[in-house]
A protein has these predicted regions:
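Bacterial N-terminal signal peptides that target proteins for export
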Residues: 1-11
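Acidic, small-residue rich beta-repeat scaffolds with periodic aromatic anchors
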Residues: 24-33, 39-45, 139, 147-153, ...
């Protein structure tokens, strides 16, 4: 091995170690309650930036009997590695409602949401789960945020990207339906932001008869493509696409 190749390898190793150290600094915000959610994730599109999220449960003063009915505030921040002061922040009171359909988990989404050549959004996925077995209702909602100066701004509000619902007897008879939505950035744009192509795939399940002789049939609907366009403030969602 030549001295030049040794030097290049050493530089590459040093850079890898420094990057690894920066990424290792990701620390979720401190929790204040058992029902709260806290998480952090490094942002691959911007290697020196980290996203943090803290969702704090606020019990309903009238209807909360078991610590499950209420709302969740949401606080987001983008920080640089090793710096305690955030570069940009966002706070929303009562961002999510939680009752019979309870907030089960949060997830930071750093997929390639490229809205302009120089601007990428990140996402927050909120997973909800219903308490009824015979009337299931599970949903995942996706919201997108962009950094503008020292603020974070929502540009997509609670798009339903997964839903599972139905009505059955818990053994066989009844109907259930699952819809999965995926996003792709379009080649066209509206008000400066790329249009978003949403692909919806719905699968149905119908059961008939008693448990021991249950007959079930699965149906697959043709995928449906829907274009979301930015109106200068937010992406407009068609009826039925926005969650609670």
């Amino acid at each position: 091995m030549t001295m030049k190749s040794i030097w290049i390898s050493a530089v590459a190793l040093c850079g890898w170690l420094m990057a690894g150290q920066a990424w290792a600094d990701c620390t979720p915000p401190a929790l204040s309650g058992e029902a709260d959610f806290s998480l952090c994730k490094n942002w691959p599109a911007y290697p020196q930036l980290t996203i943090t999220a803290l969702s704090t449960f606020v019990p309903d003063p009238v209807y909360d009997q078991d610590g499950r009915v209420g709302s969740y505030d949401l606080a987001l921040a983008v920080t640089t590695a090793g710096s305690p002061k955030p570069l940009a922040t966002y706070h929303q009171r009562s961002a999510f409602l939680s009752d019979a359909i309870a907030l089960e988990s949060l997830e930071l989404d750093t997929a390639r949401y490229k809205l302009t050549p120089d601007l990428r959004a990140f996402g927050v996925r909120a997973h909800f789960k219903g308490s009824s077995r015979v009337n299931p209702l599970d949903e995942t909602l996706l919201s997108l945020y962009v950094k503008e100066g020292d603020k974070l701004r929502s540009v997509l509000d609670r798009l339903v990207v997964y839903s599972f619902s139905g009505e059955w007897d818990g053994n066989c008879a009844g109907e259930r339906s699952e819809t999965v939505r995926t996003l792709e950035m379009g080649k066209t744009s509206s008000h400066g932001y790329a249009d978003i192509i949403v692909r919806s795939v719905t699968t149905g399940l119908v059961g008939e008869g008693p448990p021991d002789t249950c007959e079930s049939k699965t149906t697959h609907e043709k995928p449906v493509l829907t274009t979301l366009r930015y109106d200068g403030e937010t992406y407009i969602l068609p009826q039925g696409f926005k969650g609670m």
